[in-house]
Amino acid sequence: MPRRREVPKREILPDPKFGSVELAKFMNVVMLDGKKAVAERIIYGALEQVQVKTGKDAIEVFNLAINNIKPIVEVKSRRVGGANYQVPVEVRPVRRLALAMRWLREAAKKRGEKSMDLRLAGELIDASEGRGAAMKKREDTHKMAEANKAFSHFRW
């Protein structure tokens, strides 16, 4: 139990172009060394590419991709009597979004395209269609949870 009062969550302002809070949050995830303008350029460039390649609304593709990547369950280590068990636990909504964004960023970084905005655009399109490295990460997480279902009674 915390000894001090709970620190309030900071409100994130929606991004200027699309008015989306999720996109503004993703911008903060992509940002390195406080360079928000660079992150903004990468994301808006990626969304432009998505619009050109798919012909669909870029923000809809982004939201669909994020929703497809969000994990429902994950495993946490729990020590019981000298043995470590991987216990499946449900993921809280805030963490779901954070994990999805982090996985999307990491998957985009590992792609082969020339610039980050092209990589991100490719990963967004793949994730919105249910494939790609970020989706594989989600499936692997779910498989781990399914495989360790027997230890779910150790939940705390």
From Swiss-Prot:
* Gene3D superfamilies the record matches: Ribosomal protein S7 domain
The answer, when asked if Ribonucleoprotein is one of the entry's keywords, is yes
Annotated Pfam families: Ribosomal_S7
Recorded GO MF terms: rRNA binding; structural constituent of ribosome; tRNA binding
Record-level GO cellular component terms: small ribosomal subunit
Annotated PROSITE patterns: RIBOSOMAL_S7
Q: Which GO terms describe its biological process?
A: translation
Q: Which UniProt keywords apply?
A: Ribonucleoprotein, Ribosomal protein, RNA-binding, rRNA-binding, tRNA-binding
The reply to whether Transferase figures as a keyword in the UniProt entry is: no
Q: How does it assemble?
A: Part of the 30S ribosomal subunit. Contacts proteins S9 and S11.
Family in the record: Belongs to the universal ribosomal protein uS7 family.
Q: What does this protein do?
A: One of the primary rRNA binding proteins, it binds directly to 16S rRNA where it nucleates assembly of the head domain of the 30S subunit. Is located at the subunit interface close to the decoding center, probably blocks exit of the E-site tRNA.
Name the NCBIfam families for this protein: rpsG_bact
Record protein name field = Small ribosomal subunit protein uS7
- State the organism named in the record: Bordetella pertussis (strain Tohama I / ATCC BAA-589 / NCTC 13251)
